[in-house]
Amino acid sequence: MRRAVCPGSLDPIHNGHLEVIARAAGLFDEVIVAVSTNYAKKYRFSLEERLEMASETLASLRGIVIEPMGAGLLAEYCRQRGASAIVKGIRSSSDFDYEVPMATMNRQLTGVETVFLPAEARYLHLSSTMIKEVEGLGGDVSDYVPRAVLRRFHEGKETN
């Protein structure tokens, strides 16, 4: 079985993530969407909420497993899960410059390869940070995020 890992904090998951994950699902028998937590970052959504939004959004795709990644090295996580590849979406040359050293280290640590998928043009500008900023300032992000995320944004406004 060809298994890959798509890692990300997914805070929140957006249509650019979905596009990369769907393409990865076409390349591999199983894709583990590993939802990560960096304790140095401040998150809008809890890990549980991010897992729920990803699960709801990706339910129609075959071969997708969604789970928390936990602490530790991505290369070691891939080895433990039997994944031969890491799939990363690339929006720009700066993404590539950032990802290549990590891909090289991951390959040297455990032999896991990194597959880079260029983002579709309509998603080149998307980032979770930008989506949170636009939404927080009252902008309409409905073209950029799945319904599960929109619902969470609206629920957050109702409780504030």
Swiss-Prot record:
The gene is coaD. InterPro entries: Cyt_trans-like (IPR004821), PPAT (IPR001980), Rossmann-like_a/b/a_fold (IPR014729). Keywords: ATP-binding, Coenzyme A biosynthesis, Cytoplasm, Magnesium, Nucleotide-binding, Nucleotidyltransferase, Transferase. Its main location: cytoplasm. Reversibly transfers an adenylyl group from ATP to 4'-phosphopantetheine, yielding dephospho-CoA (dPCoA) and pyrophosphate. Pfam families: CTP_transf_like. HAMAP family: PPAT_bact. Belongs to the bacterial CoaD family. ATP binds at residues 9-10, 17, 89-91, 99, 123-129. This is Phosphopantetheine adenylyltransferase. It is found in: Cytoplasm. It comes from Renibacterium salmoninarum (strain ATCC 33209 / DSM 20767 / JCM 11484 / NBRC 15589 / NCIMB 2235). It catalyses: (R)-4'-phosphopantetheine + ATP + H(+) = 3'-dephospho-CoA + diphosphate. Homohexamer.
